Amino acid sequence: MAEPKTKYDRQLRIWGELGQSALETASICLLNCGPTGSEALKNLVIGGIGSITIVDGSKVEIGDLGNNFMVDAKSVGQSRAKTVCGFLQELNDSVKANFVEENPDTLISTDPSFFSQFTLVIATQLVEDSMVKLDRICREANVMLVLARSYGLTGFVRISVKEHTAIETKPDHSLDDLRLNSPWPELKSYVESIDLNVEEPAAHKHIPYVVILVKVAEEWAQHHSGNLPSTREEKNEFKDLVKSKMVSADEENYKEALLAAFKVFAPTGISQEIQDINHDSCAEVGSNSSDFWVMVAALKEFISNEGGGEVPLEGSMPDMISSTEHYINLQKIYHSKAEADFLSMEQRVKSILVKVGQDPSSISKPTIKSFCKNARKLKVCRYRTIEDEFKSPSTTELHKYLADENYSGAIGFYILLRAVDRFAGTYKKFPGQFDGSTDEDASQLKTIALSLLSEMGCDGYELQEELYNEMCRFGAAEIHVVAALIGGITSQEVIKLITKQFVPKRGTFIFNGIDHKSQSLTL
């Protein structure tokens, strides 16, 4: 068997050893192992999830051979849970795999305590009543839940957890934490020791842009009552001031300074989002507070004291044109400041842990260090219960989506994916499931959908007429290509939740295979 670092080399580059460790200790339960569930679990098994338990009471049918790669002709008539479990185990023998041959709807009703043993439950192809019951069970047991369903050419993914906190959110774009407009004493002292008017051309061409911009910002502030540029005109004047320091037109370090000038104009202090997290009621910690909120409480203290209104410094520097000496010196200054901030935070975390009666060493140094490095990018996600969303959706958002042509497909499928469950409850079949009933089923489905819209406070709205016929043509089929996409997105969100890295999707993700669109609805 390959060593973990070799086996998982590529993904370790994405979520690191801490993330991989979280995956390898996680326990996942999958309800229904049709193509959607099998595809979701396949991705997690290959990624090295700790253990899986499949719950499915059905037998493999001939129809399964056309849309599920985790069964074969030899398995027809055998337990689907056992068959899929066996094939998945072959993909990664380090994953513990179990199966339970029972109908998930029955298990939800008869043995709710079963789910408390898992880190996360993936529930696929459940009808509305079962989703509501399972969500209630998982919330009471503090187990994360991801709901997924593929239905013809549409499908959805919906996360349901009380609260999810993420430290390593890894945004696509973020501003380098260089503090060019609020340098601390050591950085200021080093910058002041460098002369921008040095006569030697080679030396002038290798002054890093951090030094150039801090010096020019200081000069600007001296002539503008201590203020930095704020208007477009002032920003252009600032850039002209940078240009005036150039000796020749080919000085790449000054060109870098001009391109990075916007970093001087960035607002100082902390973002509104981080302020909101600091003022969250959970930041008033107690003996049952999570590690995240203990560190937030420490961050709040840090900002008010040694941070001087700022979060801990990240400590990393981007590449830039510079002499080796200047770059290494700057690197040391940034690293030393980040380390000092970390040590201050560590002491505050320990002090708070003692105060609330927890073990002062219960939060590891790497965790605190990661928190400090990502303190500008923290995220707190809270999700409504499925029951709340179904019983009292946001009418403001609903009206907005129904009135917006761009969302007509997504909101239409959202309504109809609920309507087909009501249809099945009334007629004991899904619309279009049997040949020859499409027109009648479409009419009955429309009646149910309009009734549902009325219950949701949306009288007078109509869905696209063709969607009723499309839902009947789907016949509740799980098409493999759609199941693979929905399963892939499901596993992606599961990894985000377990590793606590990246930001999980908010609301209900809807895939519209007819228009080749995917959108999220927050209701």
UniProtKB/Swiss-Prot annotation:
Domain of life, source organism: Eukaryota
SUPFAM superfamilies given in the database record: Activating enzymes of the ubiquitin-like proteins (SSF69572)
Matching InterPro entries: APP-BP1, ThiF/MoeB/HesA, ThiF_NAD_FAD-bd, Ubiquitin-activating_enz
Pathway recorded for this protein: Protein modification; protein neddylation
Principal place of residence: nucleus
CDD domains given in the database record: APPBP1_RUB (cd01493)
Purpose of the protein: Regulatory subunit of the dimeric ECR1-AXL1 E1 enzyme. E1 activates RUB1/NEDD8 by first adenylating its C-terminal glycine residue with ATP, thereafter linking this residue to the side chain of the catalytic cysteine, yielding a RUB1-ECR1 thioester and free AMP. E1 finally transfers RUB1 to the catalytic cysteine of RCE1. May function redundantly with AXR1 in the RUB conjugating pathway. Seems not to be functionally equivalent to AXR1 in vivo.
Name of the protein: NEDD8-activating enzyme E1 regulatory subunit AXL
Lineage, highest ranks first: Eukaryota, Viridiplantae, Streptophyta, Embryophyta, Tracheophyta
